[in-house]
């Protein structure tokens, strides 16, 4: 039993794993904060002795701060997001994107998938003598197009199926 088995690890120097370098160390990215400006040369600080030998404070000189040019200027842009408008089978009030006026939409009914499906269903039921065309006369079975009354632009469509 003195021979080590294949499942035993060979004894040797153990190496402790170290933490990987940080992102800044790896990529060489500086911090996002600008470096402070270099100090301006000014008067020496300390006490100045007067003629009577007593210490007095030096006169204070104020220098105006020098603006640091920012190479990474941030431009602010305001974005207006308009919610999508849901069209239904009745007129809606909205601002027309073409003429930019507040309008109430005009409706136009067109044969759509539900109209043709209803016609085919009536035809299969035996309404061949013209009764199968009734869905083309019923607005509740047709698709609805919304138009601007001012510029006549198509604003949207409500599809029933």
Curated annotation (Swiss-Prot):
The keyword Nuclease does not apply. Phosphorylated on tyrosine residues in response to EGF. Keywords: Cell membrane, Cytoplasm, DNA-binding, Endosome, Golgi apparatus, Lysosome, Membrane, Metal-binding, Nucleus, Transcription, Transcription regulation, Zinc. Widely expressed. It is found in: Cytoplasm; Nucleus; Lysosome membrane; Early endosome membrane. A motif (PPxY motif) lies at residues 20-23. It is a peripheral membrane protein. GO terms for cellular component: cytoplasmic side of early endosome membrane; cytoplasmic side of late endosome membrane; cytoplasmic side of lysosomal membrane; cytoplasmic side of plasma membrane; extracellular region; Golgi apparatus; Golgi membrane; lysosomal membrane. Its main location: cytoplasm. Zn(2+) binds at residues 96, 99, 148, 151. Residues 76-160 form the LITAF domain. Induction: By estrogen in vagina, cervix, uterus and kidney. GO terms for biological process: cellular response to lipopolysaccharide; negative regulation of non-canonical NF-kappaB signal transduction; positive regulation of canonical NF-kappaB signal transduction; positive regulation of transcription by RNA polymerase II; regulation of cytokine production; regulation of macrophage cytokine production; response to lipopolysaccharide. The keyword Cell membrane applies. Transmembrane segments: none annotated. Residues 111-134 are annotated as: Membrane-binding amphipathic helix. One of its GO terms (molecular function) is zinc ion binding. Belongs to the CDIP1/LITAF family. The PPxY motif mediates interaction with WWOX and NEDD4. The LITAF domain is stabilized by a bound zinc ion. The LITAF domain contains an amphipathic helix that mediates interaction with lipid membranes. It interacts specifically with phosphatidylethanolamine lipid headgroups, but not with phosphoglycerol, phosphocholine, phosphoserine or inositolhexakisphosphate. Plays a role in endosomal protein trafficking and in targeting proteins for lysosomal degradation. Plays a role in targeting endocytosed EGFR and ERGG3 for lysosomal degradation, and thereby helps down-regulate downstream signaling cascades. Helps recruit the ESCRT complex components TSG101, HGS and STAM to cytoplasmic membranes. Probably plays a role in regulating protein degradation via its interaction with NEDD4. May also contribute to the regulation of gene expression in the nucleus. Monomer. Interacts with NEDD4. Interacts (via PSAP motif) with TSG101, a component of the ESCRT-I complex (endosomal sorting complex required for transport I). Interacts with WWOX. Interacts with STAM, a component of the ESCRT-0 complex; the interaction is direct. Identified in a complex with STAM and HGS; within this complex, interacts directly with STAM, but not with HGS. Interacts with STAT6. PANTHER family: LIPOPOLYSACCHARIDE-INDUCED TUMOR NECROSIS FACTOR-ALPHA FACTOR (PTHR23292:SF2). This is Lipopolysaccharide-induced tumor necrosis factor-alpha factor homolog. It comes from Rattus norvegicus.
